[in-house]
UniProtKB/Swiss-Prot annotation:
Gene (UniProt): eno
EC number: 4.2.1.11
Keywords: Cytoplasm, Glycolysis, Lyase, Magnesium, Metal-binding, Secreted
One GO location term (cellular component): extracellular region
PANTHER family assigned to the protein according to its UniProt record, in alphabetical order: ENOLASE
The keyword Acetylation is annotated on this UniProt entry: no
Organism annotation: Thermosipho africanus (strain TCF52B)
Cofactors required: Mg(2+)
GO biological process terms on file: glycolytic process
Entry's cofactor comment: Binds a second Mg(2+) ion via substrate during catalysis.
Keyword Secreted among UniProt keywords: yes
Protein name: Enolase
Any one Gene Ontology molecular-function term assigned to this protein's record: magnesium ion binding
InterPro entries: Enolase (IPR000941), Enolase-like_C_sf (IPR036849), Enolase-like_N (IPR029017), Enolase_C (IPR020810), Enolase_CS (IPR020809), Enolase_N (IPR020811)
HAMAP family xrefs: Enolase
Length: 429
């Protein structure tokens, strides 16, 4: 199969935080068009591929992306014209060679990823296939269990909570549609509880609430209360997941972690997590240690990795080399997958494949700076990942992904699978 790319064009648009980002359109010879917008993170891992920003303080506080846009229009486009849009791997390799750096700092990961995603969309549209079927083939059928970020802290909020995300996980639901309902009803119950306690119920970047509470544990207790208030059973219908983002409160000089008002050593932090795991139905903990603290991950995984999903985000940055190291060290049993951490569709699929073949789960993830683009919803189903993290139950850029998953579930009909607890295949529950 062969279809030529006849046009590649990029423009500067805005993300959900009002910051510029890159949108790319790719046109094929049959008139098919693929469009994609690149997301952007707030708490970024130091090993992520480079997001190119202009640095011109007179425009968008230095966050403009005209250089990345120019790189697409002037440097990338001429190289792709006439190439076969159906050969995603070849096209992504052309992009990587054109950039030639380890972290995509020449062209920018935001330029490369925008093109990579848009090519995939254009090819799918040309074949009149849904994106998940194009990327995943006939066996793409698993709807993901959502990890819904309803209380925000850390770098995502201006409050006193250290842990970045407190999530509800409706793994006990029979279908994705019902899981979404469980989540939405719990979200509304949570809002009512916070309001009655006198907390502000404005939402943060990812659509969750950002109350000032006594400590991190109180946030978990409030979630349990909300789950019960919505008529569900914690630990049966709905579980809890945490994204600690520990690199954000790690002190490199002392080697300690500042959490809940005091400094903790690695061993003290592990005991803190273990006490939470024993008290509450916590099914997943992301980035519990600094992104270079491999030993802490190894120790923690050895102690609790059989019953709790330990997710590496900043640890791996969707990078096959770092993931391979984690596999060899047995550092975690799960990886967070973010397209823009690595910067191309092919490399993302490679990371997912490597994790799967080593019995690690994949959690497909959004970024805090998102857009209306729903690529990750299709990616989750395409790869049968079984898990997705795409924010709370408010803000259209988050809901867009959930609504796309509803459409996919409907389209798949009886073939659709929602695996619930079985999606957490790297642990025993």
């Amino acid at each position: 199969m062969y279809i030529e790319i006849i046009d590649v064009f990029a423009r500067e648009v805005l993300d959900s935080r009002g910051n510029p980002t890159v949108e790319v359109e790719v046109m094929l010879e049959d008139g098919s068009i693929g469009r994609a917008i690149v997301p952007s993170g707030a708490s970024t891992g130091k090993f992520e591929a480079l997001e190119l920003r202009d640095g011109d303080k007179k425009r968008y506080l230095g966050k403009g992306v005209l250089k990345a846009v120019e790189n697409v229009n002037e440097l990338i486009a001429p190289k792709l014209l006439g190439l076969n849009a159906y050969d995603q791997v070849y096209i992504d390799n052309v992009l990587l060679e054109l950039d030639g750096t380890e972290n995509k700092s020449k062209l920018g990961a935001n330029a490369i990823l925008g093109v990579s995603m848009a090519v995939a969309r254009a090819a799918a549209n040309s074949l009149q296939l849904p994106l998940y079927k194009y990327l995943g083939g006939v066996n793409a059928k698993v709807l993901p269990v959502p990890l819904m970020n309803v209380i925000n802290g850390g770098a995502h909020a201006d409050n006193n909570l250290d842990i970045q995300e407190f999530m509800i996980v409706p793994a006990g639901a029979p279908s994705f549609r019902e899981a979404l309902r469980y989540g939405a009803e719990t979200f509304h119950a949570l809002k009512k509880i916070l309001k009655e306690a006198g907390h502000v119920t404005a939402v943060g970047d990812e659509g969750g609430f950002a109350p000032n509470l006594k400590n991190n544990e109180e946030a978990i207790q409030v979630l349990i209360q909300a789950i019960q208030s919505a008529g569900y059973e914690p630990g049966k219908d709905i579980f809890i997941a945490l994204d600690v983002a520990a690199s954000e409160f790690y002190n490199e000089e002392t080697g300690k972690y500042f959490i809940d008002g005091s400094e903790k050593t690695v061993d003290e932090l592990i005991e803190y997590y273990k006490s939470l795991i024993e008290k509450y139905p916590i099914i997943s903990i992301e980035d519990p240690f600094d992104q270079e603290d491999w030993e802490a991950y190894q120790k923690f995984n050895k102690e609790v990795g059989n019953k709790v999903q330990i997710v590496g985000d900043d640890l791996y940055v969707t990078n096959v080399k770092r993931l391979q190291k984690g596999i060899e060290l047995k550092a975690s049993n799960s990886i967070l997958i973010k397209l823009n951490q690595i910067g191309s569709v092919t490399e993302t699929l490679n990371a997912i494949e490597l994790a799967k073949t080593n019995n690690m789960t994949n959690v497909i993830s959004h970024r805090s700076g998102e857009t209306e683009d729903t690529f990750i919803a299709d990616l989750a189903v395409a790869t049968n990942a079984g898990l997705i993290k795409t924010g709370s139950l408010s803000r259209s850029e988050r809901i867009a992904k959930y609504n796309q998953l509803l459409r996919i579930e409907e389209e798949l009909g009886d073939v659709a699978q929602y695996r619930g607890l079985d999606a957490f295949y790297s642990i025993k529950r």
